[in-house]
Amino acid sequence: MSISRRHLIAGAGTLLVVAACGDNSKSSSQSTEPDPGTTGFTIAQRYPSNTFVPGKVRLPISISNKQTLLTTGPAVLNGYVLDSTDKQIATVSAPIHSTDIVIPYWPIVVNIDQPGTFTLRLDGDDGFGAAFLVSDPSQVTVPYVGSPLPPFDTPTVDNHRGVEPYCTLTPKPCPLHEVTLTQALGSGAPVAYIVGTPAHCQTGTCAPALEFLVKSHSRVGDKITMVHADVYSDDAATTVAPAVAALGLDYEPVLYLVKHGTVVDRVDVIWDQQELDERIDAFLA
């Protein structure tokens, strides 16, 4: 499967607006103090399309004022979900997440029991909301919660497998290249597998996402075998790496938490250290 850089970027949909605002892990969370007075905002989708199946759906969103993503927002966003007939099927609520990222986000989570097209509405939004699609599992090409994660021989320190550089995190490669994904899955240990390119990410979230996972790696040690695969095979970002095609991905970053070869949790596009630690702790519980 061949995916061009343009196709990879396009797969993230409206996530391109985020890139222009330059999320950077070195920024302080102090720049994103909640502003409870924000109203009339547009919902900026920070989730991929065509990847959701019935069950628990995570919808990370940011908020914007016309064309500008806001660096402040309410401490909590509340709202509801409508089905294709505009019937309300769920209420939702999510706290702001802004630890060491410039643009805060709210990870909305809702349980959807059947495929369909839905609309997320939030109190104080501009009246339009944000659409999302839940598909029959047979129509989803990427691994999802409950499906197996296929093994793949990802680049390691000892064998880059044609990916140069094998890790674009700076100032030095991340420590998550000691074993391949195949070896990690075969070990029987819980596995965390992240695909993302810190150097060429178009959403501005890949470098902080990987840095947060490295910190989690230091915290939990060998309780989880962690593996990273970069997105491009070359430093010019002209050729998509085989690891991306192996999963059928058209967006990044993505983190899979896996037990006994089965995906237990999948986190898409954006997370901060707080949310990541919460999800890893739940994964290990």
Spans of features found by a protein language model:
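Thioredoxin-like thiol-disulfide oxidoreductase module
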Residues: V231-Y251
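Non-globular targeting/processing and membrane-anchoring segments
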Residues: E33-G186
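Non-catalytic, surface beta->alpha helical segment in thiol-disulfide oxidoreductase systems
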Residues: V263-A285
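A short, hydrophobic beta-strand/beta-hairpin element that forms part of a small beta-sheet core
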Residues: P253-V264
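Typically the conserved alpha-helix immediately C-terminal to a functionally engaged Cys/Sec
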Residues: G204-S218
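Short active-site neighborhood of thiol/selenol oxidoreductases, capturing the structured segment around
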Residues: G186-H200
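N-terminal export signals
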Residues: H7-D23
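Short, low-complexity, disordered segments immediately C-terminal to signal peptides
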Residues: G22-T38
